[in-house]
């Protein structure tokens, strides 16, 4: 056994032993590999010196038609991704313990503001496949220090097709415990042009936990209960000639609360102060409804013979409006807390840009990928406050507009980058790759009157206030990567990879904070966090990876050990949810992998994927466990599948493990360790192919386990006591839920 591991992972032994193994495996032949467009170099997974996963349409359909949400499906199938919080957003969901970038057809959905709505972006009905690159990457700029997800949409076919889907699920917890979905798409064309138009709609009802109690609506990141989702998407392809092609993707997406249901906070906000229990109510009357609304358009031109090179050019535009749930703010001191205001924020982003990528092969052994990227983003946010007296009397059910203020400083972000990536085949076994990306980023921050001071002026407690000065700042970053890939056989590769990632922390939560003194009705600015005095520093991550993959007829596996080190850390100020950037280094290391086995001459299959992870921060020269506010727990999933004839059955399990810390080192004299408890869920998914169409069925949380989600354990740490009782933010997982779905393609 030792020799086998040394042979796989030691480069010196690889050079001596791999030629023999290559010759022995020639007869087997290599399985066709899907090209990963997210690599920007038209390479397949077998040609990449980095952990890469491709979730194909059959896997997506099995999970989604079995009732899984996009976030839940990804957490089940991507080893390095954290478990889902089951809410609207992916806040707190990391890859390999760090932030991830999400794209649709190569257009990134991440903005400078870390709003975490990237996975509240598309109905899975419109997804063809999903590409995943684990670990830090600079292929598409900053923000992907933990990994990259590229959602590839369905495109039109030459032959005429109609696709229909209808389904629903329920836990039989009450009359409102039911979700429904319906979707339709039509596509067609000819040799020169094709297109697809789709409309999908999802309605969510109430959710109940394993004990039959209704799950509270998430009033922090907003929940999915009692909401609706509409996704309208059109794609078109025009083949100009044998080498040139145009592709167009347009989308309108809206996911929003139904406007009738909300969180009852008790008379005089008794549930906020801990004197009563909150519960969901259907009597909401609010002037602001939480949700996500997005428009996206993407035009791509490709030419496979541009001066002897492959050329891909993209121009794109995205705008989005993110609205949050009405949120109380406490004042006073324990035990005499009281609610001083209740409001809801709305944040708007406009984003446009372009990319140019060329792939060339100057000589047979050398492949070059190079190009330029340019992007511009503008951001603004406001906070709508509601009539406090009416909100108190109704327990937060009657929310009439009283006044509005700015929530964060408005700003723009511009990026201009060039990159060069090279891949050289040293011999039939070894491929050396490396590259560099240089990116220039400019931030322009507007002047901003402090958030609390704006409230005081709006309520008449003050007449004026100094503005915290804005300004302009820029960043210059050169990010490098290098890798060595060894083709042990046609079916087996091992690699070592080094890559750098970069992120600029959330400027909205960093700038615009100040200390004021009230003098005669005027707030005088004493000190502040501003561009001139305290520039927001970027965070660079160095990531290392040693991996191995094997793709056989029966056994398929990919395993990688990883280590990443960042030069700084982000800390959350729980009094106002702003951030600080500290000089504390952060290291994250672990083992990520997946194993699938298809039993020979059988309809059975089994598999597992896992991510064993540890996160640490260096404080005062000593490595400590990363606080559970942001630390990722280890995770393992497993499944058994049986697919005889027209049947396809799957039993799958997901286990997340405990994660703990040594106390909140951002607070003085804090030594009490904290823990997020792990839990296990079991799902049964199945389908049967009918003479016309397919029927899918599922039982999620098969054992009806009662548990608190990772986010439901993390939210009280972040929001309580500043924003109310911890019970207000303790979100349970959904109990046993039955699903039924019918789909047909003709």
Locate each region found by the language model:
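Extracytoplasmic beta-strand/coil segments of soluble accessory domains associated
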Residues: 37, 71-108, 128
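Short acidic/polar hinge/loop motifs at secondary-structure boundaries
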Residues: 107-134, 184, 234
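A beta-strand signature from Gram-negative outer-membrane beta-barrel systems
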Residues: 122-165, 745
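Gram-negative outer-membrane beta-barrel transporters
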Residues: 165, 425-432, 441, 551-575, ...
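Transmembrane beta-barrel wall of Gram-negative outer-membrane proteins
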Residues: 175-204, 213-260, 293-304, 361-366, ...
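Face-selective signature of the C-terminal outer-membrane beta-barrel domain
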Residues: 239, 243-253, 288-454, 485-487, ...
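Membrane-embedded beta-barrel scaffold of Gram-negative outer-membrane proteins
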Residues: 300-304, 308-328, 487, 493-499, ...
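C-terminal beta-signal and adjacent terminal beta-strands/loops
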Residues: 502, 657-664, 687-746
């Amino acid at each position: 056994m030792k020799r086998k591991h040394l042979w796989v992972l030691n480069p010196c032994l690889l050079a001596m032993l791999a030629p023999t193994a290559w010759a022995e495996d020639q007869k087997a032949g290599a399985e066709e590999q899907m090209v990963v467009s997210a690599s920007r170099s038209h390479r397949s997974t077998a040609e990449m010196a980095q952990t890469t996963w491709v979730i194909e349409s059959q896997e997506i359909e099995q999970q989604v038609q079995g009732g899984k949400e996009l976030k839940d499906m990804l957490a089940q199938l991507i080893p390095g991704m954290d478990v889902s919080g089951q809410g609207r957003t992916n806040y707190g969901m990391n890859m390999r313990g760090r932030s991830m970038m999400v794209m649709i057809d190569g257009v990134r959905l991440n903005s400078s503001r870390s709003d975490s709505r990237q996975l509240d972006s598309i109905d899975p009905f419109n997804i063809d496949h999903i590409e995943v690159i684990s670990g830090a990457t600079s292929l598409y700029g900053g923000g992907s220090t933990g990994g990259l997800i590229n959602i590839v949409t369905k495109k039109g076919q030459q032959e005429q097709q109609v696709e229909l889907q209808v389904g629903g699920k329920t836990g039989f917890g009450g009359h409102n415990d039911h979700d429904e979905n319906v979707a339709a798409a039509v596509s067609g064309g000819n040799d020169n042009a094709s297109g697809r138009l789709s409309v999908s709609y999802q309605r969510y009802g109430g959710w109940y936990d394993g004990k039959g109690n209704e799950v509270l609506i998430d009033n922090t990141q907003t929940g999915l209960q009692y909401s609706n989702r509409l996704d309208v998407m059109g794609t078109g392809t025009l083949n100009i000639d044998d080498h040139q092609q145009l592709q167009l993707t347009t989308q309108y997406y809206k996911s929003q609360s139904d406007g009738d249901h909300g969180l009852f906070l008790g008379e005089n906000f008794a549930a906020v102060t801990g004197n009563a229990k909150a519960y969901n109510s259907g009597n909401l009357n609010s002037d602001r409804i939480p949700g996500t609304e997005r428009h996206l358009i993407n035009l791509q031109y490709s030419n496979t013979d541009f001066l002897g090179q492959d050329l891909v050019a993209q121009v794109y535009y995205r705008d989005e409006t993110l609205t949050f749930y009405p949120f109380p703010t406490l004042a006073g001191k324990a035990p005499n807390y009281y609610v001083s205001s209740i409001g809801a924020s709305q944040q708007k982003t406009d984003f446009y840009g372009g990319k140019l990528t060329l792939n060339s092969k100057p000589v047979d052994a050398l492949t070059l990928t190079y190009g330029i990227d340019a992007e511009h983003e503008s951001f603004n946010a406001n906070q709508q406050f509601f009539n406090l007296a009416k909100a108190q009397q109704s327990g937060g059910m009657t929310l009439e507009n009283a006044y509005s203020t700015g929530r964060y400083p408005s700003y723009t972000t511009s990026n201009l980058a060039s990159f060069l990536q090279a891949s050289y085949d040293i011999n039939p076994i070894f491929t050396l790759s490396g590259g560099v990306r240089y990116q220039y980023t400019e931030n322009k921050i507007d002047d901003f009157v402090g958030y609390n001071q704006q409230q005081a002026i709006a309520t008449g407690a003050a007449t004026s206030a100094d503005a915290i000065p804005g300004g302009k700042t820029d960043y210059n970053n050169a990010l490098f990567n290098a890798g060595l890939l060894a083709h042990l056989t046609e079916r087996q590769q091992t690699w070592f990879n080094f890559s750098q990632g970069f992120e600029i922390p959330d400027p909205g939560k960093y700038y615009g904070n100040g200390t004021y003194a009230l003098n005669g009705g005027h707030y005088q600015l004493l000190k502040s966090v501003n561009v001139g005095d305290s520039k927001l520093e970027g965070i660079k991550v160095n990531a290392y990876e040693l991996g191995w993959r094997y793709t056989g007829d029966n056994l398929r596996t990919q395993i990688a050990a990883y280590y990443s080190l960042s030069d700084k850390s982000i800390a959350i100020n729980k009094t106002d949810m702003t951030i600080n950037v500290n000089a504390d280094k952060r290291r994250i290391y672990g083992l990520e992998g997946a194993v699938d086995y298809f039993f020979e001459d059988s309809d059975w299959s089994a598999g597992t994927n896992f991510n064993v992870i540890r996160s640490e921060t260096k404080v005062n020269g000593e490595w400590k466990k990363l606080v559970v506010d942001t630390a990722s727990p280890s995770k393992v999933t497993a499944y058994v599948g049986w697919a005889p004839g027209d049947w396809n059955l799957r039993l799958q399990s997901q286990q997340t493990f405990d994660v703990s810390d040594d106390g909140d080192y951002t607070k003085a004299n804090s030594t009490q360790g904290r823990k997020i408890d792990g839990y296990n869920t079991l799902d049964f998914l199945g389908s049967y192919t009918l003479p016309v169409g397919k029927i899918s069925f599922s039982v999620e949380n098969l054992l009806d386990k009662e548990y608190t989600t990772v986010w439901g354990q993390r939210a009280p740490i972040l929001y309580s006591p500043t924003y109310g009782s911890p019970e207000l933010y303790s979100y349970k997982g959904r109990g046993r839920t039955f699903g039924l779905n019918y789909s047909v393609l003709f």
